Amino acid sequence: RNHSSAASDVYKRQDKDTGFCVCGHVHDNEAIGSPHDHGTSWAIYGQASGETEMTDWEIVEKNNSDDVVNVKLKKTYIMKAGDVHFYDVGHVHSPVRKHPVRLLRIEGANLDNIKRSNIKVIT
């Protein structure tokens, strides 16, 4: 993923029994995320403060020969403090954070160890 500024993980802990990971993020500057999935895991995003402009992408084609997933824009919405959103396995989304933001993300597994899809936006 490409970001204009990286997130600062203020907390990341993996539960040894379930494998779930809890991550607390602080974005003090603009942060723009590329369309991505969470591989074979799901994720729950909880907005603690600020706003995130989130875009959902529709999978148009999965090309197994070059391992590329083509997507097109589906919808864009604003996540405000108190909003929570579940992203199931394979769901493609991208966040834009223009102002300071704090958020909590719960992952079904530690994403540091999971391969993510190679996603390409088509128009």
What are these regions (language model features)?
Residues 1-7, 11:
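Single conserved hydrophobic/aromatic residue that forms the stacking wall/gate
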Residues 23-38, 88-90:
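Conserved short histidine dyad/triad with adjacent acidic residue
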Residues 24, 42-46, 85, 95:
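His/acidic/aromatic-lined binding-pocket segments of jelly-roll/cupin-type domains
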Residues 40-58:
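Glycine- and acidic-residue-biased ligand/ion/polar-headgroup-sensing regions
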Residues 44, 59-90:
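Short acidic-glycine-tyrosine-enriched beta hairpin
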Residues 96-123:
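Double-stranded beta-helix
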